[in-house]
């Protein structure tokens, strides 16, 4: 009960709860940094959302937060960590809400719509077939 109260207080104040609590309804663990979280929980810097469980958090849905790494699929709505770009899209990924593939930026990488273009890079050639038909731009060093 104490863990649940700390988690709720953290959600409403924008801080991080200490310890872990069980997400009501499905037994998912809610971690102080990353792990399974309920709606409204802040995503820590350097983390992304990688999975969605519709029945988690007593039917409100729960999100799995993990540290970002090169070549990770993330759910639609996940933050994009600085230095990373979006290079592919799967409309059925993340339990049907859509998923984006994150890669570290490098010269000659194809990026999807909504991908940030980091400083020192620019977009050039366009391919309408890229990113599962959403279109993609070749990103090169400026």
Where are these regions (language model features)?
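Post-signal peptide N-terminal regions of Sec-secreted extracellular proteins
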Residues: 24-142
